[in-house]
Swiss-Prot record:
A motif ('HIGH' region) lies at residues 57-67. Its EC number is 6.1.1.5. A motif ('KMSKS' region) lies at residues 593-597. The keyword Repressor does not apply. Gene3D superfamilies: 1.10.730.20, HUPs, Ile-tRNA synthetase CP2 domain-like, Valyl/Leucyl/Isoleucyl-tRNA synthetase, editing domain. One of its GO terms (biological process) is isoleucyl-tRNA aminoacylation. This is Isoleucine--tRNA ligase. The keyword Heme does not apply. Binds 1 zinc ion per subunit. The gene is ileS. Zn(2+) binds at residues 887, 890, 907, 910. It is found in: Cytoplasm. Its cofactor is Zn(2+).
Amino acid sequence: MDFKETLLMPKTDFPMRGNLPNREPQMQEEWKDMNIYEKVQARTKGRPLFVLHDGPPYANGDIHMGHALNKVLKDMIVRYKSMAGFHAPYVPGWDTHGLPIEQALTKSGVDRKSMSVAEFRKLCEEFARKQIDRQREQFMRLGVRGDWWNPYVTLDKGFEAQQVKVFGEMAKKGYIYKGKKPVYWSPSSESALAEAEIEYHDKRSPSIYVAFPVKDGKNVLQQDEKIVIWTTTPWTIPANLGIAVHPELEYSVVAVKGEKYVVASGLVETLESALEWENPEILRTIKGVDLEYVVAEHPIYGRDSLVVLGDHVTLDAGTGCVHTAPGHGEEDYIVGQKYGLDVLCPVDDKGYMTAEAPGFEGLFYDEANKPITQKLDECGALLKLTFITHSYAHDWRTKKPVIYRATAQWFASIENFRDELLRAIQEVKWVPEWGETRLYNMVRDRGDWCISRQRVWGVPIPIFYGENGEPIITDETINHVSELFRKHGSNVWFEWETKDLLPEGFTHESSPNGQFTREMDIMDVWFDSGSSHQGVLVEREELDRPADLYLEGSDQYRGWFNSSLSTSVAITGKAPYKGVLSHGFTLDGEGKKMSKSLGNVVIPNDVMKQLGADILRLWVASVDYQADVRVSDKILKQVSEVYRKIRNTYRFLLGNLHDFHPATHRVAIDQLNGLDRYMLAKLNDVINRVKKAYDEYQFSTVYHELHNFCTIELSSFYMDIAKDTLYVKHADHPDRRATQTVMYDVLVALAKLLSPIIPHTADEVWKHIPGVEEESVQLTDMPEPIELGDVSELKQKWDAFINVRDDVLKALENARNEKVIGKSLTAAITLYADGDVRQLLEELGPLDKLFIVSAVKVAGSVADAPKEAESYDDLAIVVEKAVGETCERCWVVSPTVGTNNEHPTLCADCAETVATYYVTK
């Protein structure tokens, strides 16, 4: 007789290998066929609503690891919430306006000048929609569940209509105004930029010190004295109209080689070195406040340069006397307004010097640095020229430097509702907590928001002008334009006559002849996405404002978190979100920024083709995402190994439940032995800790808890001990059915708990679990702890046993190394124990099964142990070769092998089992 046939070995169709790159797309097709998103929504309808509002990625190009990190984090939260008592719809979105799409079309050979604005905008829309299709497919391949075929898109008519309403409401409250002031200007994009569109890179710039002769010293300075300024932008010298000093700083008149220079006293020593002054002599000192209204002379043009007071002046660098060009700097502009200085800006849209900079007109601003510096040298005003490398503002799209340039722009006046913004920030839950301080400080210190852009692909600013140039924004015009956009889209602004965009019969006192024009600038794209709380949360019936959560990268404190807060507080007085969660950036394995030139870019599509989406998702769960995270082939390989262990755990559990049907085979809790109840108690602990971690968005805790549970509590402990019961006992043995009961509960819980992280694998497991009714684990709820009563004593006892077992395993390993035994089933152990350990050993049983050896004897106290015994706390262990023969069926070494004539190669237990259940009588 082949005794292997009498062993109940694991049987399952659940494959050992995940083969995720092939199996996941099949699973996703099944989800699509069963309308899984709609089914989840239908199942949870009526529960408390949880809205995670999707910050829209830009519709251009393939997704990168930052996208993958972001979307998987969102998906894990939404999946968990829908299994944890909430109704959690997820509406993905896309940001579709702006320069990158214009540039992509131009690069592809589209000649913008050969067509109308409306025609070009139609091409932009076509391009954006193709990009959405491309990215949607990739996001869905990640296993992200959402309303993918009904997303929100910022170019959709309904969204644009709501955006116009937001603008109109802000205008109605007096928050929108037009002004000429310096804004970030990108010559490469020919447009104003918002702070969120700026990034910093190192740039080499000239560093010059320039002397401005005193023209009218106001009895404080003399005409032979010169005020020294420092700048790294010589091209702005033609725009100089003033010199700022700090009212509370002390200034010195310093004599050097017959010249007299005015600089901050605190910088004399630094300047002595920087300007190579020999034996400088301080002639007198003056308070900054006393220098106000002194008139200096522009070294090139001879015009007045007024000395003004400014709190922005510091001793950090320069001379303490700050070159002031109101057309080229925010602080310069503010102080210039105070003193009535003109806003001179001799640079055009493309960055070329205009006729307002005589002698330099037609030069690109950066190229004007050299001739301007040479001219200053000719005038005898240049004291020093060097070059420095410093961090400088660049256009985030073109990667080219930007300048400050005063132009006529539309602004949202943050000043008018700054206090409301700051109050709203304090009412939001921020994770990490430092997010609150970061945004609070940004909002506290930020200037007004420049919302106009000199481009064509975007939502037009819905403003008309009367015959006298007066801007017209009324409830009537806003509502009418909003309805036009809802019906026809915003392209009509560029296609129709102005009169056709106005309400029928519209009149206004600024246009006695009924003639009107319209604004041709578009809105900043941050106004688009920043209006999504209105365009999506209010517009869509299944959502609500405020959202429960906004979750984006930490760069969005100055981007979407900020713009959304600004528009929402402006029109509702409240933040659009109850909570904000931010994540870090994705770096390579060494913590370096990914770049094509370094060859260290990890591409999500490649990872999914090679390893599968569940591996990428498991990586997301494994990292501390609130800081910057690392990813590389090596790291993903380590995650794959963890996945393999989890999958093996699933497979072992399924394999040993092949003949278990919960309806008929489940054993009642009170019928379970101590070890089985202990395992369920450990499962309860894991369920509680994992659900708490999910609630707190601590996914790495979920990952470690479940990985450790699979490898330590299950594989290395319970499943190891359970094998004998599962394989050797007959099918319906109460101990075997009890073990299967525990395994079943563990399996169902593990499928549910891991479902938000590895949904493809969890659903694959679910299909193989006997007795489950739901067609997908996604249509179930998170597991609840099993009612076990008070288990504190039980846990204490078995925790203590695990410590004893660890000591026994060490002793067995040492005996194996010394060739005393082979496998642990060839061993017999004698235990000498004192105190609690002895009591524990006497209470537990059968010890040979628990230690997975052939024989265990509990002898005297530790003091009685022979010298060769291995000693541990309150325990000494002797390992010997077990006496008897090896049973052919269970591999235990037993003196009872050979005592049964029918089955002489079996131990007594196996002989009885075989005779009773497997021999035909």
